[in-house]
Amino acid sequence: MEIEFKLERRIGALSDNPSGYTKELNVVVWDGKYTKYDLRTWNPNGKPGKGITLTKEELKKLHKLIGEEIRQMGGRNE
């Protein structure tokens, strides 16, 4: 059984590679009922690869954690 999805909104691409795959943050409806923030790799034909889905609350928490990490990094090049 194949999982159904509908790409509701493209938020942005984080990276892409020479073979055409992109790592993107999007809003996706999974199985016709679950709308989630979605961070994953997509192939050039629009087929999803491995990734994670996040609720609005999880996305906010991730934003906070990333902000804290960036502040701790300061001027370090990592």
Regions found by a protein language model. Give the residues of each.
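Positively charged, low-complexity terminal tracts
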Residues: M1-E78
